[in-house]
């Protein structure tokens, strides 16, 4: 098996021009020398531990068998490249920073800084600089590049610092622009071996390494010194030499207890040793000395490699360093005022500077010496500071665990190797990889540390390559705990930099973590197009068989067509790892073949199949006509789902498994759309060209769905289909149900039940007809089988009387009276077409018990909503339908004359139903439903539909002929709709005792107060209808049921599995006729209350009618059932109640209009009272309007008294004032004051009688004011009963005679 090649992303390159400039500046006269030859080290065959990998011999990458899938093709063996123009790069010292954004190249005493611009793929020269002085003593032996954090923001970069160590022990600090900031000498006798700026999670430090020891420079002190130097140089206050001689760099020289010379030093962070409690107080000074510490001390740990010890760990106590930091901080504070106040007053003092090379060494103990016989070449610390990778001269690469200080991995066969680390982050997880470049083998490898697995490997074209770390972008005194990804870069023979890109999932390649590896790849597959090259490549990288199976199945679910699925499976089989899929591809191809054939047979027939005019079964002609009409309407539906939308092959494979015994398609896991698509797929061939027997054997028998669920799916498909249904499809459906019934008994009963439960009447009619045809066919087949059995046996003929019950032919009720059922359901469908609202559409099983009532209800709703006037109702539903009902003749001829269609005109729809079931539409029955529908609409929205109650009280007494039906309808309306509202109005007016609150009563009433009077008037009309209906005690009515409906009801009982005598819901008319007769006197008692309430509300009186107008016994009778018989003293009440009634009528007469006084007179007659004020107020109102004729008649029936005389005198005075205005005369002052004072407000009320010329009262009334004065004087002259009351008439007679010559009494 092959290993995944290393992904090398092109990052940056050194252009030819830049390379020539750098080469010429650094190398000078040595620029044309031969390329740098790598030193060879001798190999040894030392014994290794059992976990070493034997990779010493040169092997090809393509034959490795670490992990992964086998791929074809092999990489060509790399050869040594020729001389390159950039091989000088490997002769120089190369350092990187911030993912190779900055490069530091040093040679002898010169250095060059290169930088990669963000938008360019090549390096640019930032500076070219050298160290002044003796070129031999200033030869650069060590270098380092790091960032300097900003003073105020530790996350911001201030500048790049270049640190250079020389042969004479100096360390110089430059900026990236080549400006020297500071230098210090750390040794006089030794060169600087290395400079390292180390950053770990627990801290950071700057290390200067020599042969026997190393300096640990405090980072705070280094930052302070560099910033002071930048400020002083920028202000030109001091030179670099003056700064370096005046400012001291705080450092500490550590002398570890080692044997050989130091090669490498790695800072491994701060640690607490796992020592016993008794050793906490031990001191290095002497055996008896004791150190008191509150807790375990912190130690700075270093890993050191020497010439005699492969790896040794150095421990340094942090206590002294902490004291050092305090001194640095104090020193920094003392320096700040020295630039200002101290210097201003001339009292500043320069601190005593201690040279770094003069510092005394501090002893540092060592622990855990590892492999003394080896000599290290290269070292590299992991990004998380847990591991250190070391190469030795024995061609080994060792990985050391810092925490346990042990070797955890050893790799063989990597002589002169370069090592580096790469870290990759995903969410909160970090993966680390070790990159190894073996130049002798031209091999680049990537290993995981945790699993010890080679995840990537690749041959490179030339050995003149290298791997370098990208350089951390950590800054001096910046944040240490923030993790960032670490990158490594591969430098090829052309000097181009390539970033080694490693996906995170490669870290999960251990055999115990293959499921996690596959999980990451599955995430990639979700975003990859199924069937593409990338998808197949990722699929081949999966490790576990379960992952392959899951991925294969999920990929199948995303496919659309069968051809695409076949191609996909063929491609999968070409992959070597497809054998782990087992039998999945075979079963999938089998299922896809079934799907493809089913889809192919779904196409409609062409040419050879002709539409048939009739069915293959003996259906009645009227049934065929009705079914043709509804089948045509069935295909005209546009609001249903698309029949062509079938399951895609992916969905088919996801939800349907042909190997299963049963699939519950009606479980919660299936959505409604998925069921519909499955139904379209299964029953598509039924509407296509597939032979029905072959269709049943190859589709319905093979699909793992129960027969009952198949029927449900067919119902879903048939219910929402838009396909045109013809007799061919009808016959095929019958044959399908025949086969289903043969295989499992009870299918037709299930279809029957579905038809009865359907709200779609055309669908139910077609299904019932299909079941009828299937049952007839089953009966015929059963009879043929019995005839064959009788022919096989010679049976003797017997007399019919001797036959047993089993020998008689059984009659199936379900197969009888299909014509009656279809005709009634056709009328139901016509009735539903009258309404646009579908809220009243019920199931057929709910309509069956009351077909006639349901049809009339729909007709009533149409009449109310249209609306239809009374004349149209009389025309559509005549009161005497004897001509239609008396028609005699052949029933078949009458059915042929019936028109079967769905007309647009609603009145024509009524006529179509009337010709089929005329008795359903008797006049009184229809009007009764109309009245009930009006009141129902009023009760739902009382305020908006208030006019319906008036229409009902108008239609009810005029149109319903039968008094018993009229009485029942009025009684039901009163009890259901009127009674509670009427009672609430009475309670609201009373407002006494523990009555309901005003808010509750208004809510019960449901309309505004302005409509209360009109409602009470309609209540009076309803009560009047009840009284008129019971005067003659009408007998119960007997409505005959339509024969067609009766036969259909008996057949429906069989379909509903009920007996023929099952309870049938009462019609509304029958329910109304059964209402008990009301008590005439109790109804009259309520009418008196309604009239009294209306008078009170119209006149605005503050009165309590129940407490004042009726006695206690009468109050108890209110709101009782109208058919009860309580004691009601209508006219025999106590005197107190009579007086209150009298006072009430007097107030109405005084404050009401003529209409209210007319109603008050009606109450007066009912209560047998004599109220003079009513007649007199009527007369007075007539005189005010100039109707003297009517006023005289009313005055004649009044009791004459002085009070009436005064009222008439005021009207007479008002007429005299109007007469003066008409004659343009002026009264004397005394007369004028007298008449005005006497007339008062009546002067503005009086007027002459005005009406049309056809009015007979025009000639009987005065036409001028003079005639009016004379007429009223004569009529009122006899009213006064005393001399005092007659004085105004005598005086006004003199005034009329004096001024106008008119008089009515001779003085």
UniProtKB/Swiss-Prot annotation:
InterPro entries the record matches: Rab3GAP2, RAB3GAP2_C, RAB3GAP_N
GO biological process, one term: synaptic signaling
Biological role: Probable regulatory subunit of a GTPase activating protein that has specificity for Rab3 subfamily. Rab3 proteins are involved in regulated exocytosis of neurotransmitters and hormones. Rab3 GTPase-activating complex specifically converts active Rab3-GTP to the inactive form Rab3-GDP.
GO cellular component, one term: autophagosome
Main location: cytoplasm
Subunit and interaction comment: The Rab3 GTPase-activating complex is a heterodimer composed of rbg-1 and rbg-2.
UniProt source species: Caenorhabditis elegans
Pfam families: RAB3GAP2_C, RAB3GAP2_N
Disulphides: none
GO MF assignments: enzyme regulator activity; GTPase activator activity; small GTPase binding
Keyword vocabulary terms for this entry: Cytoplasm, GTPase activation
Subcellular location: Cytoplasm
Family: Belongs to the Rab3-GAP regulatory subunit family.
Domain of life from the UniProt record: Eukaryota
Name of this protein: Rab3 GTPase-activating protein regulatory subunit
């Amino acid at each position: 098996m092959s290993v995944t090649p290393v992904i090398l992303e092109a990052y940056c390159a050194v252009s030819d021009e830049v390379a020539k400039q750098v080469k010429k500046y650094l190398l000078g006269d040595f620029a044309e020398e031969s390329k740098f030859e790598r030193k060879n080290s001798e190999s040894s065959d030392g014994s290794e531990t059992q976990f070493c990998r034997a990779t010493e011999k040169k092997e090809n990458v393509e034959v490795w068998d670490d992990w992964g899938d086998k791929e074809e093709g092999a990489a060509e063996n790399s050869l040594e490249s020729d001389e390159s123009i950039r091989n000088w790069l490997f002769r120089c010292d190369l350092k990187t920073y911030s993912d190779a954004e900055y490069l530091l190249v040093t040679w002898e005493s010169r250095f060059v800084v290169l930088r990669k611009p963000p938008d360019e793929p090549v390096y640019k020269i930032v500076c070219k600089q050298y160290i002044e002085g003796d070129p031999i003593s200033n030869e650069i032996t060590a270098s380092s590049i790091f960032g300097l954090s900003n003073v105020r923001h530790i996350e911001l970069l201030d500048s790049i610092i270049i640190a250079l160590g020389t042969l004479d022990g100096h360390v110089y600090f430059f900026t990236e622009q080549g400006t020297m900031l500071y230098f210090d000498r750390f040794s006089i006798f030794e060169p600087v071996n290395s400079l390292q700026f180390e950053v770990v999670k627990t801290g950071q430090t700057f290390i200067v390494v020599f042969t026997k020891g190393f300096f640990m420079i405090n980072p705070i002190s280094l930052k302070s010194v560099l910033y002071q130097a930048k400020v002083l140089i920028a202000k030109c206050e001091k030179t670099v030499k003056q700064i370096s001689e005046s400012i001291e760099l705080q450092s500490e020289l550590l002398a570890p207890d080692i044997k050989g010379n130091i090669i490498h030093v790695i800072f491994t962070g701060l640690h607490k040793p796992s020592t016993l409690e008794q050793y906490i107080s031990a001191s290095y000074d002497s055996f008896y000395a004791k150190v008191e510490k509150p807790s375990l001390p912190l130690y700075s740990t270093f890993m050191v490699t020497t010439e005699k010890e492969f790896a040794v760990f150095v421990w340094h106590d942090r206590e002294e360093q902490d004291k050092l930091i305090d001194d640095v901080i104090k020193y920094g504070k003392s320096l700040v005022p020295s630039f200002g106040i101290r210097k201003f007053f001339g009292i500043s003092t320069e601190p005593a500077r201690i040279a770094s090379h003069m510092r005394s060494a501090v002893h540092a103990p060592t622990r855990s010496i590892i492999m003394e016989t080896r000599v290290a070449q290269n070292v590299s610390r992991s990004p998380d500071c847990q591991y250190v990778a070391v190469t030795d001269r024995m061609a080994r690469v060792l990985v050391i665990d810092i925490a346990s200080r042990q070797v955890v991995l050893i790799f063989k066969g990597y002589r002169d190797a370069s090592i580096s680390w790469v870290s990759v982050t995903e969410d909160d997880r970090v993966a680390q990889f070790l990159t190894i470049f073996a130049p002798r083998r031209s091999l680049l490898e990537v290993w995981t540390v945790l699993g010890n697995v080679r995840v990537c490997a690749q041959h490179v074209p030339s050995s003149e390559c290298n791997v370098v770390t990208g350089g951390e972008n950590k800054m001096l005194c910046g944040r240490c705990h923030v993790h960032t990804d670490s990158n490594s870069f591969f430098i090829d023979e052309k000097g181009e930099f390539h970033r080694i890109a490693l996906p995170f999932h490669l870290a999960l390649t251990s055999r115990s973590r293959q499921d996690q590896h596959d999980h990451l790849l599955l995430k990639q597959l979700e975003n990859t197009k199924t069937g593409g090259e990338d998808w197949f490549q990722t699929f081949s990288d999966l490790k576990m068989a379960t992952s392959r199976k899951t991925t294969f199945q999920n990929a199948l679910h995303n496919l659309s067509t069968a051809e695409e699925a076949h191609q996909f499976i063929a491609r999968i089989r070409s992959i070597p790892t497809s054998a782990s899929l087992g039998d999945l591809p075979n079963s999938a191809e089998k299922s896809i073949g079934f799907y493809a054939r089913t889809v192919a047979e779904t196409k409609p027939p062409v040419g050879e199949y002709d539409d048939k005019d009739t069915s293959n079964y003996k259906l009645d002609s009227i049934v065929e006509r009705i079914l043709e009409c509804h089948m045509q309407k069935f295909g005209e539906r546009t609001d249903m789902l698309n029949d062509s939308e079938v399951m895609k092959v992916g969905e088919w494979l996801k939800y349907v498994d042909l190997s299963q015994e049963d699939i519950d398609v009606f479980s919660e896991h299936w959505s409604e759309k998925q069921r519909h698509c499955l139904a379209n797929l299964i029953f598509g061939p039924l509407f296509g060209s597939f032979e029905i027997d072959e269709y049943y054997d190859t589709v319905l028998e093979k699909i793992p769905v129960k027969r009952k669920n198949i029927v449900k799916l067919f119902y879903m498909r048939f219910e929402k289909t838009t396909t045109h249904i013809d007799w061919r499809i009808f016959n095929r459906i019958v044959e399908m149900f025949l086969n289903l019934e043969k295989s499992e008994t009870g299918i037709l009963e299930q279809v029957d039940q579905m038809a009865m439960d359907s709200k779609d009447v055309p669908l139910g009619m077609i299904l019932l007809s299909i079941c009828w045809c299937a049952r007839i066919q089953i009966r015929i087949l059963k009879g043929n089988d019995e005839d064959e059995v009788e022919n096989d046996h010679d049976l003797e003929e017997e007399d019919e009387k001797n036959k047993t019950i089993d020998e008689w032919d059984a009659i199936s009720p379900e197969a009888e009276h299909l014509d009656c059922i279809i005709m009634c359901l056709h009328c139901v469908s016509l009735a539903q077409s009258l309404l646009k609202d579908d809220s009243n559409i019920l199931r057929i099983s709910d309509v069956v018990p009351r077909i006639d009532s349901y049809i009339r209800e729909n007709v009533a709703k149409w009449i109310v909503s249209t609306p239809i006037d009374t004349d149209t109702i009389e025309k559509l539903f005549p009161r005497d339908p004897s001509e239609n009902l008396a028609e005699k003749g052949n029933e078949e001829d009458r059915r042929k004359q019936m028109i079967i269609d769905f007309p647009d005109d609603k009145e024509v729809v009524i006529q179509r139903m009337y010709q089929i079931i005329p008795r359903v539409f008797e006049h009184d029955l229809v009007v009764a439903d109309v009245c009930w529908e009006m009141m129902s609409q009023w009760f739902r929205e009382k305020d908006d539909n208030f006019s319906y109650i008036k229409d009902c009280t108008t239609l009810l007494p005029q149109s319903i002929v039968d008094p018993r039906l009229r009485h029942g309808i009025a009684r039901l309306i009163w009890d259901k709709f009127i009674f509670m509202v009427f009672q609430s109005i009475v309670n609201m007016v009373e407002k006494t005792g523990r009555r309901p609150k005003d808010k509750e009563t208004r809510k019960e009433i449901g309309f505004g107060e302005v409509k209360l009077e009109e409602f009470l008037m309609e209540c009076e009309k309803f009560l009047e209808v009840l009284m008129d209906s019971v005067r003659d005690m009408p007998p119960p009515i007997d409505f005959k049921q339509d024969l067609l409906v009766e036969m259909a009801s008996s057949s429906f009982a069989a379909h509903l599995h009920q007996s023929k005598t099952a309870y049938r819901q009462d019609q509304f008319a029958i329910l109304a006729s059964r209402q008990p007769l009301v008590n005439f006197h109790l109804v009259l008692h309520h009418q008196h209350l309604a009239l009294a309430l209306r008078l009170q509300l119209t006149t605005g009186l503050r009165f309590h009618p129940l407490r004042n107008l009726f006695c206690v016994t009468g109050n108890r009778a209110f709101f009782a059932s109208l058919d009860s018989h309580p004691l009601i003293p209508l006219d025999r009440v106590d005197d107190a109640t009579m007086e209150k009634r009298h006072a009430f009528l007097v107030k109405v007469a005084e404050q009401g209009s003529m209409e209210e006084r007319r109603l008050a007179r009606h109450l007066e007659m009912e209560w047998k009272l004599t109220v003079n004020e009513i007649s007199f107020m009527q007369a007075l109102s007539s005189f005010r309007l100039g109707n003297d004729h009517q006023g005289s008649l009313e005055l004649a029936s009044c009791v004459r008294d002085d009070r009436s005389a005064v009222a008439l005198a005021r009207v007479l005075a008002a007429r005299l004032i109007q007469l003066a205005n008409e004659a343009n005369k002026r009264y004397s002052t005394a007369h004028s004051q007298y008449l005005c004072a006497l007339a008062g407000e009546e002067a503005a009320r009086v007027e002459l009688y005005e009406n049309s010329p056809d009015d007979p009262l025009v000639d009987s009334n005065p036409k001028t004011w003079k005639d009016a004065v004379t007429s009223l004087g004569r009529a009122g002259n006899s009213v006064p009963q005393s001399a005092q009351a007659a004085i105004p008439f005598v005086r006004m007679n003199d005034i009329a005679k004096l001024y106008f010559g008119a008089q009515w009494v001779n003085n």
